[in-house]
Amino acid sequence: VKKRELACFGGLTMVCRDLGIPRRRIGANARFRSRVKSGSGRFAMKFSRQTTLRSHATVTGVGVHSGLPVNLTLGPAPVDAGLVFVRTGLDEADREVPAVAGSVVSTDLATVLGDRQGPLVSTAEHVLAALRGMGVDNATVEVDGPEVPIMDGSAAAFVAAIDQAGIVNQSAARRYIQVLKPVRVAMGESFGELRPHTGGFRAEVEIDFANPVVGRQNFSIDLSPESFRREISRARTFGCMNDTARLWSAGFALGASFENTVVFDDTRLLNPEGFRYSNECARHKALDAIGDLALAGLPLLGA
């Protein structure tokens, strides 16, 4: 069944991961800012200094694609460190990879980060969304397996871990990337766009599936820790049961289940508990976009 997805995400045009659109450098269409005027939005005003985690917090689960058990630990990091993955459990020494666009080695059904030696951490987008959405600038993400645990398919467990660790202000001012003019990348009827916006960061998503269970859904959000927690942190990843055999044969979705994925067939939703939101699929696309946009390396001011 041919599906059509329309996506307009505030920020970088590298967000269309599932569409195979290549990640692009921001170039002349953005600039860095270390201060934000008082009229630039609640998120920017409230968090004027860089933040990190007060302590460590660990979650345990399985990888949605690998099916392997994995432990993930969030921890503090110094000023200007950014978000850094630390791959442990290897035969050799632990390896670090910064959460930036240049670290992306694959976008086939998930965002995979790595270095010159190869892939290190897959399915990074949900934990990155939680860290960016909750306003954490600098943190380490230790993972002892090849993939971030899927948990319940949303970012809720990572938000809970951030709450457990606590957030503290640091000594340096927060820096931003401000979008200066519109830029669009398109593939067929699908596109990703970034444009200027004076109110912090706003994401707008529209998806349109031929499958009537999903259909056309819209969602928009002015991002803040409160709105992220309330509006999208609990939105789960989703997929069609008809795609299962194809995904399994390609080595994907080996850890997927009704406990961590919204599953539907041609006519109905198969999860007994139903949707968490009427437009949960669009909300989850926004979650994925926020996570991928964290690879810009700094918070975005745009829409």
Task: Label every PLM stretch briefly.
Residues 41-138, 142-303:
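C-terminal regulatory domains involved in ligand/effector binding and gene-expression control
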Residues 34, 38-40:
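Serine residues within intrinsically disordered or low-complexity segments
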Residues 3-6:
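Positively charged N-terminal leader segments that act as targeting/secretion signals
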